[in-house]
Amino acid sequence: LVEGFQYGSLGFKQIDGGGKTGFDKRDYLAKFRVNTNPEAKTYQSLTFKIGKATETSHETYLGLTEDDFQHDPYRRYAGSQKDLMETEQSQLSATHFINLSRSFHITTTVYRSDFSRNWYKVDNVTDSAGVKTSIGKVLEDPASYQEAYSILTGASSSNLNALAVRANNRSYYAEGIQSVLDFNFITNDISHDINIGLRYHKDEIDRFQWDDLYAMNNGVMSLTTAGV
C-alpha cells in the first residue's frame, strides 16, 4: 500500500509591498506486509510502515492593529515578509503478529518517529533610541510606539538592527518497542478479552533558536546581523 497526499494554497492575505502568504504540505505513507498461510497452525505476519511529511508555510505571528484590521483584515505588514514555517516528519515501524491459538495472540511493534520544525518569525522592534518593543505591545498601542509601528509597516529604519526575526527551531524524536498479549475466552456465555502489554519508550526534544536582525528599507527587509 502506497499513499500520497499533497495540498496547498497561494494564501488569502496581502503583504505590503508583495510576498508569499500561502503554504504547501506533502504527506506520503507506504506499508508492506509478509505473512504465512492464513490456514497455518501458527499464523504470523510482519508489517513494515514508513512515512514522510513536510510543510512550508509563509505564515506569521504578526497581526494588525485594531484600526488596520477594521480597514482591511487581509492585510499583512511588510515586517512579516520573512516569516516562514518549515516542518519535516518521518516515521518507521515494524509490527510482528503471531496467533498462538484461538485464545492467544501477541502483537509486537518497534517504532521510531522524528519531527523537526523551524518557525522563523518577527519577534520585536528596536527604534532609533535603542528601545526594544515586542510586536504584541506595538499592535496593542501603536500611538505609544509610533516609530516601531512605522518600521513594521515598511518605513525605513535608521537603526540597522531594527527588526529581530527569531528562528524558533525545534527537533523531536520518539522511539520504543511494545508487546501486547491478547487473551480471550468465554465463561457461562460471557466473552472476556484481556490485554497485557509491556512498553519501553524514549523521547527527547532539542531546542536551539536564534535571532537574525534586519533593517527596513522602503518596505524591504535586509539582513544586517546573522544570529548564532
Question: Language-model segments: which ranges?
Answer:
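Transmembrane beta-barrel wall of Gram-negative outer-membrane proteins
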Residues: 1-8, 16-58, 87, 95, ...
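Glycine-rich loops and low-complexity Gly/Arg-rich segments
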Residues: 2, 25-30, 71-75, 131-136, ...
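Flexible, solvent-exposed coil segments and beta strand-coil junctions
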Residues: 3-14, 67-77, 87, 151-163, ...
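A short local loop/turn or secondary-structure capping micro-motif enriched for an aromatic residue
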Residues: 9-11, 55, 115-117
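Outer-membrane beta-barrel translocator domains and adjoining extracellular loop/strand segments
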Residues: 12-20, 58-67, 119-125, 207-213
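Face-selective signature of the C-terminal outer-membrane beta-barrel domain
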Residues: 39-41, 46-47, 87-228
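Surface-exposed loop/interface segments of Gram-negative outer-membrane beta-barrel transport/assembly proteins
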Residues: 40, 47-72, 224-228
